[in-house]
C-alpha cells in the first residue's frame, strides 16, 4: 500500500526527489541491498547533495518511511472523510482498496514491515517509525469499529488488523490474487461483533 506512484514531477524539491528515488529502490530491492551510490545515480544527485539533506542512510530511511506513512494517510482519507457511508462500509472499502494493491504482481509488501524485518534491534529510529505506522493503522480500525457500533471495538479492530497484515504477507510471498472473497469475510467478521438487539 501507499506506493501508487513513483513518477517524479518537475516541481519536486531536491529533498523529495531523493526520497522518491530511495523509496522506489528500497521497495523493490530492500534496504541493505540498496547502496548509496545507486540512490545517487537514480536521483541524479552528487554525494555532497545527498549528505546535505540526509547525513546518514538511516536518516534517509526514516524520511522514506515517514513519506510512505503520509502517502497512505492521504490515500485513506478519501475513504475516511466520506460522510455518506457508515463505519462498517468504510472498513469494507479499506479492505477492497487494499486487495486491489495486494493483487498487483508488482506489490513488494508493506515497506514498514520490510524495514522492521531488516532493522529490528539494530536501529531504534527506524523501529519507531515502523511501530508508529502500524499503531496508526490499528487506531484507524479501532475508530471505525466504534463507528460501526461493535460490541468490543478493540477486539474487532485487532482482528481486522491481523487480517489486513496477513493479506499483505500472503500477497508478498505467493504473488497471486487472493482466492477467497475478502469482502464477504470482513463483512461476516464485523457482523459477528454487532449487537443485533440495538440495531
Residue ranges and their predicted role:
Residues 103-124, 128:
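Amphipathic alpha-helical segments used for helix-helix packing
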